[in-house]
């Protein structure tokens, strides 16, 4: 015999079943996420080291640790995931890309371009940086036109988005890649190179340390920096994308900027 009261209770019963199922599957889902994003039990965050930190670059502290926006973001992401954080230091972003196939890191924050999008999976952009050039002390170069001349030697950090941008931009000057920021700074100081291509914020910091150098006013490329994970890690990408989106809106990213000497730097998530 049909019982109307039983029929009315079905939605509540269904909700109860779904709730129980959710409670049962959530731990398994969390374990699956950790297995994919932190397979060693730690969140291994790939960072690149330079003397001047920034939204992408990190620095090594006197105590032997690391500081920088990616360092702070990685620490917070690990806390949300519920695992310890471990930093995997590299000389530049190109080395981070080269290491993706070796499985030595789980997440990173680095500049992206079409070439890199074929090697790893990117989430949201959190920085847009203007790339330009700094010229050596005593240089007669004043703009891009006088820079792009035969015989002019321009340095860039090897295998980076900025290096590829400089090669595309300069038709006559020769662009050569070097492994480290420090090596290029030494060549610029000694006058062995004429210019160095990098983001404006990094070059402004460099100009204060190397007297006589000048940062050109023009911009040849906008470099976008985003969170990234190794390819074919859909759960890791979804978690990283959600984390960064929330970090942009809830003040976590702003706090990381402010704590790393970027209080006057606006957060830019879109190119012009």
Residue ranges and their predicted role:
Residues 71, 86-98, 142, 176-186, ...:
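Short helix-initiation/N-cap motifs at beta->coil->alpha
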Residues 31-111:
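Extracytoplasmic small-molecule ligand-binding "clamshell" domains
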Residues 68-80, 145, 159-160, 204, ...:
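Extended ligand-binding regions for polar small-molecule ligands
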Residues 41-49, 64-67, 145-159, 174:
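Short loop->beta-strand "edge-of-pocket" segments that line small-molecule binding or catalytic clefts
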Residues 128-138, 200, 204-245, 263-272:
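Periplasmic-binding protein-like
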Residues 75, 79, 84-148, 214:
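Acidic, polar ligand-binding/catalytic clefts
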Residues 32, 161-176, 215-216, 245-272:
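Ligand-binding clefts/hinges and TM-proximal coupling segments of bilobed small-molecule sensing domains
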Residues 94, 111-119, 165, 189-221:
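A ligand-binding cleft/hinge motif common to bilobed small-molecule-binding domains
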């Amino acid at each position: 015999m049909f019982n109307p009261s039983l029929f009315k209770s079905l939605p509540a019963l269904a909700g109860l079943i779904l709730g129980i199922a959710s409670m049962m599957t959530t731990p398994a889902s969390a374990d699956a996420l950790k297995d994919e994003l932190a397979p060693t039990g730690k969140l291994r965050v790939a960072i690149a080291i330079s003397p001047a930190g920034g939204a992408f670059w990190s620095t090594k502290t006197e105590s032997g640790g690391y500081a920088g926006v990616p360092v702070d973001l990685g620490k917070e992401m690990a806390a949300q995931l519920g695992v310890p954080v471990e930093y995997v230091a590299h000389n530049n972003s190109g080395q981070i890309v080269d290491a993706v196939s070796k499985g030595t890191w789980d997440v990173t924050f680095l500049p992206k371009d079409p070439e890199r999008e074929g090697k790893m999976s990117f989430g949201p952009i959190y920085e847009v940086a203007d790339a330009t050039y700094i010229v050596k002390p005593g240089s007669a170069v004043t703009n891009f036109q006088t820079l792009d001349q035969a015989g002019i030697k321009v340095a860039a950090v090897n295998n980076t988005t900025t290096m590829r941008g400089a090669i595309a931009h300069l038709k006559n000057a020769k662009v050569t890649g070097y492994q480290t920021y420090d090596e290029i700074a030494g060549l610029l100081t000694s006058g062995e190179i004429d210019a160095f291509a990098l983001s404006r914020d990094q070059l402004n910091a460099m100009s204060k340390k190397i007297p006589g150098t000048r940062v050109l006013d023009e911009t040849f490329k906008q470099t976008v920096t985003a969170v990234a994970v190794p390819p074919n890690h859909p759960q890791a990408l979804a978690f990283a994308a959600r984390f960064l989106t929330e970090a942009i809106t809830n003040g976590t990213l702003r706090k990381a900027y402010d704590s790393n000497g970027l209080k006057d730097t606006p957060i830019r998530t879109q190119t012009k």
